[in-house]
A protein has these predicted regions:
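Class I SAM-dependent methyltransferase SAM/SAH-binding core
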Residues: 53-143
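A short acidic, Gly/Pro-enriched loop at the edge of an enzyme's catalytic core
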Residues: 141-152
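A short SAM/SAH-binding and catalytic strip from SAM-dependent methyltransferases
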Residues: 151-165, 188
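Conserved hydrophobic residues forming the short capping helix/wall of the S-adenosyl-L-methionine
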Residues: 72, 124-125, 203, 288, ...
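Conserved catalytic/acceptor-binding region of the Class I
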Residues: 166-167, 173, 177, 181-251, ...
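Conserved class I S-adenosyl-L-methionine
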Residues: 1-49, 63-67, 71, 120, ...
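Conserved Class I S-adenosyl-L-methionine
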Residues: 3-9, 27, 217-311
Length: 311
């Protein structure tokens, strides 16, 4: 967001909490790309199999922090230490498919600029029994951590919403240990994301507010070359990027656009009339209807995963 203040996202925290559990399976699928890019097993070997410290930025109410915590969960009966914030939660969930990366264990410090998001994250971690995670409110442009505190810094769909994304990149570089890795998942351009294009057009037509009017710029890291240059300027080396375009298969009667729409525009939609809400849903359905095949929506999303090291 071009205005990365706690108040901006505080008004959306209830929407994020509302959808979190229902979106968890889909989140887990795309989070795997970040875990692979972090190359936890190789990093753990470089650290002599010592527990890794992971910092997740803009964690919202849990992802991808939960996925990283499961990937680094200690086998049953063992514990890991590291990282350092408050609000640790319950026993590890070793049944998740991403748990127990070979030769790697560790601790995740989840963070978000909105305290209410952090509270929701801590509650969900306790409910799911994730032990190797802690949570702390933090502004990624001014992190409350010492230099060289973490082995991995991760951020999914967050850095583009900062007031100063380049300062956020520099802060991530600062808190990484030498040889550590930063991994960012960012949206590709809107033209490659038909759901967002439909959302922007329909909300603009009916409510007079789209991404620009809301001060949102989800696509500012959409140009891979420019984004890699920004990471290099921040001090990172060994920068790589991959692009992913998955498409789900969702029954056409399911208004699958509501989670993303609520989590970005929930504060506006709550004031919309029932007539406007109905018109919005009808217009988005019509706009995305070319993606219906055999009674199912198959709408692609497109994102990049940027990965880099601190020398």
């Amino acid at each position: 967001m071009t205005n990365n203040s706690p108040n901006t996202w505080q008004h959306l925290s209830s929407d994020w909490i509302n959808w979190a559990d229902r979106l968890a399976p889909a989140a887990e699928k795309i989070n795997r790309h970040m875990i692979e890019a972090a190359d936890l097993e190789t990093l753990a070997r470089l650290r002599g199999d010592a527990p890794l410290d992971v910092l997740d930025l803009a964690s919202g109410v849990g992802e991808p922090a939960f996925s990283f915590a499961r990937a680094l969960a200690a086998p049953t009966g063992e514990t890991t230490t590291g990282g350092g914030a408050a609000n640790d939660a319950g026993p590890a969930n070793s049944n998740d498919v991403s748990a127990n990366t070979p030769h790697a264990s560790g601790h995740v410090t989840a963070s978000d600029i909105v305290p209410e998001m952090c509270d929701g994250l801590a509650a969900r971690a306790a409910e799911e029994g994730i032990a190797n995670i802690s949570v702390i409110p933090a502004d990624m442009e001014n992190l409350p951590f010492s230099d060289q505190s973490f082995d991995v810094v991760s951020c999914r769909f967050g850095v583009m919403f900062c007031n100063d994304p380049d300062q956020a990149l520099r802060e991530s570089h600062r808190v990484l240990r030498p040889g550590g890795r930063a991994v960012y998942m960012v949206w590709a351009p809107m033209v490659d994301n038909p759901l967002f294009a439909a959302m922007d057009a329909v909300l603009g037509n009916i409510l007079g507010i789209g991404f620009d009017q809301a001060g949102l710029d989800p696509f500012s890291f959409g140009n891979i070359d420019q984004s890699m240059d920004r990471m290099e300027t921040a001090g990172f080396t060994g920068i790589t990027a991959t692009t992913h375009s998955p498409a789900g298969r969702i029954p056409e009667k399911v208004p699958f656009w509501k989670p993303q729409m609520d989590m970005l525009f929930g504060n506006v939609l709550r004031d919309a009339s029932d007539m406007d809400r109905g018109a919005i849903d009808a217009a988005i359905f019509e706009t995305l209807s070319p993606y219906i095949e055999d009674g199912h929506f198959q709408v692609p999303i497109c994102f990049h995963v940027l990965s880099a090291k601190r020398a």
